[in-house]
């Protein structure tokens, strides 16, 4: 087999995403750039050795506050690949590999961060994700909805 150089590899960021449910409803929110999203985000360089559940807790705390109580499954339910244009000088396109974790709200309320402008709890049986999501995140939400409706 031929040796494939590093220039043939596709570098990915890695993100954790949380499918937060409460009584048949899924939590989604809109970021300050107008894109709908799930709680979560990219793993930071210094977190390479950090357990994924600790990263999930950090991202949930940053994005939905510390008042919300929830339980998270130990293994990802959905794997996603997403491409996005960054809102930084040069607007580079980046690839993100996402691990989607199922979570259940146990109490408390969502307190949105300053990075988010709107939130919704959508009925999983009536939700049309294509009206909110695009690309790999849309594929991941569709996969998740199929999984929970089995």
Spans of model-derived segments:
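Conserved Nudix-box catalytic region and its N-terminal flanking loop in Nudix hydrolases
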Residues: 24-66
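Short, well-ordered beta-strand micro-motif
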Residues: 20, 100-104, 121-123
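Acidic, metal-coordinating catalytic segment for phosphate/diphosphate chemistry
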Residues: 1-19, 23, 90-91
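Active-site segment of metal-dependent pyrophosphate-handling enzymes
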Residues: 65-109
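Nudix hydrolase/Nudix homology domain
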Residues: 34-36, 111-150
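Short helix-loop capping/hinge motifs at secondary-structure junctions, enriched
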Residues: 26, 108-112
